[in-house]
Amino acid sequence: MQVIETLAEGLKREIKVVIPAKDMQDKMNERLADVKDKVRINGFRPGKVPAAHLKKVYGKSIMADLVNEIVREQPAAILSSRGEKSATQPEIAMTEDKDEADKILAAEQDFEFTLSYEVLPPIELKSVKGIKVTREVIDISDDEVNEQVLKVAESARAYETKTGKAANGDRITMDYVGKVDGEAFEGGTDQGAELVLGSGRFIPGFEDQLVGVKAGAEKTITVTFPADYPAKNLAGKEATFDVTVKEVAAPADVEINDELASKLGIESADRLKEIVRGQIESQYGSLTRQKLKRQILDQLDEMYKFETPNSLVDAEYNGIWSQVNNDLAQSGKTFEDEDTTEEKAREEYKTLAERRVRLGLVLSEIGEKAGVEVSEDEMQRAIYDQLRQYPGQEKQILEFFRSQPGAAASIRAPIFEEKVIDHLLTEIDVTDKKVTKEELLAEEEGEAKAETKKAAPKKKAAAKAEAADAGEGEEAAPKKKAAPKKKAADESAE
């Protein structure tokens, strides 16, 4: 077998592989010898079929199997012998001429094919001792815990039916039919809908017009959908809602005690506070981690400058760009609405894709050298987390992971990345800094606004890219699946 390099430009490689017809003939004869005692051909005793007849009957199919095996197995072996790793699966090209293909299958012509691929760039790791980051630390006050516990209590608040007029804070149960230009519209009808007046859940003006109604009342409400309402067919339009009030209920007093905890399935009020404190710590810890990771990645980005494989960058960019356009379509907005242009947005996302690929390669190299591994238990937990997000679809999702090798890799990659960050945190200079909740959130909001100015869809659309780039864990999934259709007037569902 001859392996001839025909192209070596930057990271691009093209290899011509030639397997002489004689070698192919020898391999075919070996296979024929293996099967001659096993095949049954009319007119011949087992094992006595002449080689020429055996070749005539089985030669082409055996040769086709050989060709498939070579194309399947040799690329990896060739790259390994060259000490190269391809960025993506090599492209394989062979003759499409039928006459030439027949000659190859008849072992009358050399079998040739070409491999086209990009190699992963060599990365010489640098010392990370010079990386300095600040870890923001927050002391969670009892007042903040109590405030959150109160919100939990209010969400579980009981309501008692009243006969008087509805006031802000009361919950009404109602049926309604929404109409635009006298015609009912999709998502504008609901029965038994519950709404706490003053909650701001429904579009502006809707709740205000229900203050003062009583059970049994029928009322037509007129409102105007916001100009930026996600449903294009409703944005900026005047609508009427024919409302029938089924019940008015006043909120019961909220008391944080063991009885409340018991209703929530928790043994005591003290335990409830512990759980809430833990949730707050987790939320702040996640935010602190994101910002810490961003600092590390920014400095690694400054340290490493090398050519990135176009195939990886293009794949990353295409994924980001597809999500950006999906988000714009869902919101009914354009790039101009976000104070940018498509051309500028493309440039920014291309830069983001290049940065993410480069950092991904660096983190991969660091992790490999440090012996970072993802355990089977960690994979199982991550897959279980995925299953919990899609109740009722567990079997399909498990089958997807079993049948798609890349699916498991997509689960493994972020776990590996976080473990590499954990490793780096043991190697770099980390300084703790106490901050207030307001300082932490204000800084985060400022960064979000800065990103939004560049290209507003970025933070949401490129959430997956940002997970490696800026450590943001925001999902790029659709919002609430059914709520927008169920309650078009309900802004919180959008």
Curated annotation (Swiss-Prot):
HAMAP family: Trigger_factor_Tig (MF_00303). PANTHER family: TRIGGER FACTOR CHAPERONE AND PEPTIDYL-PROLYL CIS/TRANS ISOMERASE, TRIGGER FACTOR-LIKE PROTEIN TIG, CHLOROPLASTIC. Residues 169-254 form the PPIase FKBP-type domain. It is found in: Cytoplasm. This is Trigger factor. Residues 441-494 are annotated as: Disordered. Involved in protein export. Acts as a chaperone by maintaining the newly synthesized protein in an open conformation. Functions as a peptidyl-prolyl cis-trans isomerase. The keyword Cell division applies. Its EC number is 5.2.1.8. Consists of 3 domains; the N-terminus binds the ribosome, the middle domain has PPIase activity, while the C-terminus has intrinsic chaperone activity on its own. GO terms for cellular component: cytoplasm. One of its GO terms (biological process) is 'de novo' cotranslational protein folding. Belongs to the FKBP-type PPIase family. Tig subfamily. It catalyses: [protein]-peptidylproline (omega=180) = [protein]-peptidylproline (omega=0). The gene is tig. GO terms for molecular function: peptidyl-prolyl cis-trans isomerase activity; protein folding chaperone; ribosome binding. InterPro entries: PPIase_dom_sf (IPR046357), PPIase_FKBP_dom (IPR001179), Trig_fac (IPR005215), Trigger_fac_C (IPR008880), Trigger_fac_C_sf (IPR037041), Trigger_fac_ribosome-bd_bac (IPR008881), Trigger_fac_ribosome-bd_sf (IPR036611), Trigger_fact/SurA_dom_sf (IPR027304).
